[in-house]
């Protein structure tokens, strides 16, 4: 293996193993910032040694053992709890006396719990939403600051600052590296799910920039969701979120035209929908429902997505079922955005005037003042009612509000189609 091949192998190993490595070391040092530094020390050691010695049979175990040695050095340098590095030294000696497969098993025993702790810590509500997203993608997703910056159209120094500040905040607030229990678990899990879905949504419909979608972010969010489903298999809302993302991701290819332009749901070629992702999503939804989570926020949205997925054509869509699901969702989590989606469903199920009646109750809603989808939906309903002049004005207003260039082009085209 050439030096170049070795470095490529190290890059691949790091991408896969870094979340597990950071999680395992964080359990030891109880500080994810320090854990990341120790993990990078182990990476540097690999870069120095593997080109000469070759990539180990179990590179993840090698990195973990090296990271633990660095943790001992860290405790010694900081003169913290002498017993800690003595215990860690004994642990390493015991591991080195075992065969490699036994070491693998020993590491795997704890790694699931460690990863779950890392997920909950990175998504702790003491952090801002932007910080939680950046830290989760960095620590759990294994992305570089450059990759995160490019995905969210911000500068790399901005992302780096968010991550540094997040780690400092966690240390300052003495956030424990643990999985929350009891009454704290539900709100903390909600924070984790919110972060993952925010990442997915930014990939599914980019809020700004020239691209309608950023598929890599959808893939990252799906990967995080699937990991979480394995780590917390008894949580129905985790499976509900995975179901929602799987089904929505199944439409990705059909959502873009030949030139990258947006293709709306009812205009999509359903033959391009990914049937494997749909099946996976439906299985996840069934799992959520079996666990008693049919009325969860994400499970309800997944059930709505499933209605679209099961319809062979747009005309076969069960809009009355979708409208009923939105009524349930609005009762569970009242919000103007949910009401706007309910308006769309009512417009399709019971006629455009029914939808417009709902939308018109939202026109003065302060939180939707700059939300481009409000005039977009209103324009669509007005167009169906034959009120083309008003529809054109709404589409033009929506185009002025959106920050996505592709969406702006689509909205202006819809305005033009209404005539003068």
What role is predicted for each listed range?
Residues 241, 245-248, 301, 305, ...:
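"A position-specific structural signal for the A-helix of alpha-solenoid helical repeats
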Residues 2-23, 33-36, 186-194, 198:
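A short, charge-rich alpha-helical start-of-domain segment used by transcription regulators
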Residues 13-32, 45-49, 120, 124, ...:
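Amphipathic, Lys/Arg- and hydrophobic-enriched alpha-helical face
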Residues 21, 25, 63, 67-75:
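Hydrophobic-face residues of short alpha-helical interaction/recognition segments
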Residues 86-130, 136-147, 154-327:
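Amphipathic helix-loop-helix modules that constitute alpha-helical solenoid scaffolds
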């Amino acid at each position: 293996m050439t030096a170049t091949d070795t470095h490529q192998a190290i890059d691949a190993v790091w991408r896969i193993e870094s979340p597990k490595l950071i999680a395992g070391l964080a359990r030891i040092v109880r500080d994810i910032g320090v854990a990341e530094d120790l993990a990078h020390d182990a990476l540097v050691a690999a870069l120095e040694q593997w080109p000469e010695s070759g990539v180990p049979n179990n590179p993840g175990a090698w990195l973990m053992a090296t990271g633990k040695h660095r943790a001992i050095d860290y405790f010694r340098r900081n003169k913290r709890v002498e017993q800690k590095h003595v215990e860690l030294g004994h642990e390493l000696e015991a591991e080195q006396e075992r065969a490699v497969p036994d070491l693998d098993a020993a590491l795997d025993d704890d790694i699931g719990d460690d990863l779950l702790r890392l997920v909950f810590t990175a998504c702790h509500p003491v952090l801002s939403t932007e910080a939680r997203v950046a830290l989760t993608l960095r620590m759990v997703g294994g992305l570089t600051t450059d990759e995160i910056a490019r995905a969210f159209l911000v500068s790399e120094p901005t992302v780096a600052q968010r991550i540094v500040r997040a780690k400092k905040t966690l240390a300052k607030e003495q956030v424990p590296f643990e999985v929350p229990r009891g009454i704290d678990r539900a709100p903390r899990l909600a924070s984790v799910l919110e972060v993952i879905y925010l990442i997915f949504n930014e990939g599914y419909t980019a809020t700004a920039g020239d691209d309608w979608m950023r598929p890599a972010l959808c893939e990252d969010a799906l990967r995080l969701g699937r990991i979480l489903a394995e780590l917390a298999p008894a949580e129905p809302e985790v499976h509900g979120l995975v179901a929602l993302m799987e089904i929505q991701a199944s439409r990705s290819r059909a959502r873009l035209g030949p030139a990258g332009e947006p293709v709306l749901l009812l205009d999509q070629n359903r033959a391009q929908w990914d049937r494997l992702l749909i099946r996976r999503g439906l299985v996840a939804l069934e799992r959520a429902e079996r666990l008693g989570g049919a009325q969860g926020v994400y499970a309800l949205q997944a059930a709505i997505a499933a209605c679209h997925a099961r319809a062979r054509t747009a005309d076969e869509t069960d809009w009355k079922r979708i409208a009923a699901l939105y009524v349930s969702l609005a009762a569970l989590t009242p919000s103007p955005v949910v009401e706007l989606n309910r308006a769309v469903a009512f417009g399709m199920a019971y006629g455009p005037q029914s939808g417009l009646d709902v939308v018109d109750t939202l026109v003065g809603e302060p939180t939707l003042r700059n939300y481009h989808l409000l005039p977009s939906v209103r324009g669509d309903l007005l167009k169906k009612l034959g009120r083309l002049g008003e529809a054109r004005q709404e589409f033009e207003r929506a185009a002025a509000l959106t920050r996505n260039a592709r969406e702006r082009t689509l909205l202006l085209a819809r305005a033009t189609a209404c005539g003068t």
